[in-house]
């Protein structure tokens, strides 16, 4: 069954596979066991995530203070730009926000940032995430996302399966530290 789903996804160019929270936690905690200051004072970029659904965004926002992060940046890819189209529906989080734009929600990616206690409750966490629409669709190869890549100290994500090699080259080009959590089969993927 799982192979059938992956084969269908490959043929349809559906790269929407969300990484489980516990898999992210297990991987990241291994880095912290080795060096508790791995993320201290660092800007983390999550460039291949839908921040409203991503467990990467949730995990790092919930652990922002614990890890001593400087800044968290999470970006998404616009629904209209995806090769695999599904019946996109904005979340209540987005539609209830004053900046919601019916056209931008499908044409533009989103950027979520976290770097301060926006709510004034004395802690920095998921409730302090701020968001806006990107100028473009959120493609990691765009100048807009490259600028964020260059700002980041560490890039962490589960990149689109079909773009794994391009994504890895994109990181290496900028000489950035990175953590890729995903299938070991991604490295062998060919069109």
PLM feature spans:
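Class I S-adenosyl-L-methionine-dependent methyltransferase catalytic core
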Residues: 1-191
């Amino acid at each position: 069954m799982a192979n059938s789903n992956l084969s269908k996804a490959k043929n349809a160019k559906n790269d929407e596979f969300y990484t489980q929270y516990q898999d992210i936690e297990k991987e990241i905690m291994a880095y912290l066991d080795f060096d508790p200051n791995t993320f201290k004072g660092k800007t983390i970029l999550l460039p291949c995530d839908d921040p409203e659904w991503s467990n990467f965004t949730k995990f790092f926002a919930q652990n922002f203070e614990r890890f001593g992060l400087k800044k968290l940046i999470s970006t998404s890819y616009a629904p209209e730009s995806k090769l695999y189209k599904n019946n996109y529906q904005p979340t209540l989080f987005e539609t209830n926000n004053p900046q919601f734009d019916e056209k931008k929600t499908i044409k533009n990616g989103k950027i979520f940032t976290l770097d301060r206690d926006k709510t004034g409750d004395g802690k920095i966490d998921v409730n302090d995430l701020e968001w806006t629409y990107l100028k473009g669709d959120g493609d990691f190869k765009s100048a807009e996302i490259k600028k964020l890549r260059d700002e980041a100290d560490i890039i962490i994500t589960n990149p689109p399966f079909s773009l794994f090699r391009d994504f890895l080259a994109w990181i290496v080009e900028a000489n950035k530290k990175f953590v890729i959590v995903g299938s070991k089969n991604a490295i062998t993927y060919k069109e």
